[in-house]
Amino acid sequence: VIAALSAWHEQHDAASTALRTVRALPAHVLIEAYSMLTRLPSGLAVAPALAAEVLAGRFGERTLGLPDDERDRLISALADAGVLGGASYDGLVALEARAHGATLLTLDERARSTYRRLGADCSVIA
């Protein structure tokens, strides 16, 4: 998301093209994007209101969250799949996408194995 929104990012063109038709994000991805946009280094950070406006304008207001029953089993699902540490956040993203039948687009090759272990469809942006 940050790469798609940031012309200075080395993967901007590929990410922007790949995310062109995306209109909803897993809730955790949306929060991470907002967090990053408002804390980027070297004067690149934007005001909170602008970050919210950009994200809503680009990806809409729809977020993909976990249904109640899956939220109640979140930690068990991560443990059963052998997901641990920081990869737990990737696991949350995977479960949110899977619950809505969405395919994850990523530049993060490392996260791909977590997404797959939890049954989420994913594609690496090239």
Task: Provide a role label for each language-model segment.
Residues 112-118:
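Short loop/helix-cap segments at secondary-structure boundaries that form the rim of catalytic
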Residues 25-28, 92:
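Aromatic- and histidine-enriched alpha-helix N-cap/loop-to-helix transition segments
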Residues 1, 30, 111-112:
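A generic structural signal for short hydrophobic patches within well-formed alpha-helices
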Residues 25-26, 85-87, 108, 123-126:
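Histidine- and aromatic-rich ligand-binding microenvironments
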Residues 61-110:
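Active-site neighborhoods of divalent-metal-dependent phosphate/nucleic-acid chemistry enzymes
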Residues 59, 100, 118-120:
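Short, structured coil segments at secondary-structure junctions
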